[in-house]
UniProtKB/Swiss-Prot annotation:
Domain notes: A pair of annexin repeats may form one binding site for calcium and phospholipid.
Name of this chain's protein: Annexin A4
Molecular function as annotated in GO: calcium ion binding; calcium-dependent phospholipid binding; calcium-dependent protein binding; identical protein binding; NF-kappaB binding; phosphatidylserine binding
Gene designation per UniProt: Anxa4
Pfam family, one: Annexin
SUPFAM superfamilies: Annexin
Modified residues (Phosphoserine): S12
GO biological process: one example: regulation of transcription by RNA polymerase II
Additional free-text comment from the UniProt record: Seems to bind one calcium ion with high affinity.
């Protein structure tokens, strides 16, 4: 899937020590210069922000993250701290947050595990173990149950074929197996859905979806909706959507985080921060195409203050 890339790029003429001094000045003494903080951090990429953190420590003798935490608050703080966190560690912290304490943020677990590639999943597993002294799979198993648990464990294994290889006979077989596992029988063989959707490569699955439609006269999404339910259904749909068009999947996540009354800030922040350097140029285009309004206008209407300012920069301007 060709993407245009992210809105946040490496700043040219970058000087970590100068940036560190600007940030210190913005936080020193009474009050905080939020605009200066946004001006530096929203216009540097993740790697550069790590260099700034190092320079801050070596030239000022303080921890930039601790200073930011004490100076900032609420959603604006969450965005800035997210931007200051290395990519894989940010995913890991979000997964942990989704399972910590009472209740589970199923949407967060699905979003991260269904959209990351096997190499990213491998690094997530490694980092999770280092951070928390136990495996991601262990925490998933103690926090979820039934088929939802099984699909998450399967995604956590990171066993998806990464090639482009296509075997027409296997495409037909998989499509037929999916049809027989759901639409054609009474009851559903959920494991069959899980094993095909979690292991095959993207090119193969796109052909399976076409063949499935030919056999059953239905989109695979329609069948998943009628054959499964709850978080298991959400997870399978997320996998299919990510295979078809990942930026459109994230556009939908953003739309749902803001539509109606109230805002799901944790989802809004996570998607804006984690996709800023990857496909944030593609997400607004898909948002506009599907919902008829710009992502920029949605964010503008749903947020305020410095929180709004920084998100609009990550969004990349009004399309």
């Amino acid at each position: 899937m060709e993407t245009k890339g992210g809105t946040v790029k490496a700043a040219s003429g970058f000087n970590a020590t100068e940036d560190a001094q600007v940030l210190r000045k913005a936080m020193k003494g009474l009050g905080t210069d939020e605009d200066a903080i946004i001006g530096v951090l929203a216009c540097r990429n993740t790697a550069q922000r790590q260099e700034i953190r190092t320079a801050y420590k070596s030239t000022i003798g303080r921890d930039l993250l601790e200073d930011l935490k004490s100076e900032l608050s609420s959603n604006f703080e969450q965005v800035i701290l997210g931007m200051m966190t290395p990519t894989v560690l940010y995913d890991v912290q979000e997964l942990r947050r989704a399972m910590k304490g009472a209740g589970t943020d199923e949407g967060c677990l699905i979003e991260i595990l269904a959209s990351r590639n096997p190499e990213e999943i491998r690094r997530i597993n490694q980092t999770y173990q280092q951070q928390y002294g136990r495996s991601l799979e262990e925490d998933i198993c103690s926090d979820t149950s039934f088929m939802f648990q099984r699909v998450l464990v399967s995604l956590t294994a990171g066993g998806r074929d990464e090639g482009n290889y296509l075997d027409d006979a296997l495409v037909r077989q998989d499509a037929q197996d999916l049809y027989e596992a759901g639409e054609k029988r009474w009851g559903t063989d959920e494991v069959k859905f899980l094993s095909i959707l979690c292991s095959r490569n993207r090119n193969h699955l796109l052909h399976v979806f076409d063949e499935y439609k030919r056999i059953s006269q239905k989109d695979i999404e329609q069948s998943i909706k009628s054959e499964t339910s709850g978080s298991f259904e959400d997870a399978l749909l997320a996998i299919v959507k990510c295979m078809r068009n990942k930026p459109a999947y994230f556009a939908e996540r953003l739309y749902k985080s803001m539509k109606g009354l109230g805002t799901d800030d944790s989802t809004l922040i996570r998607v804006m921060v984690s996709r800023a350097e990857i496909d944030m140029l593609d997400i607004p285009a898909n948002f506009k195409r599907v919902y008829g309004k710009s992502l920029y206008s949605f964010i503008k209407g749903d947020t305020s203050g410095d929180y709004r300012k920084v998100l609009l920069i990550l969004c990349g301007g009004d399309d």
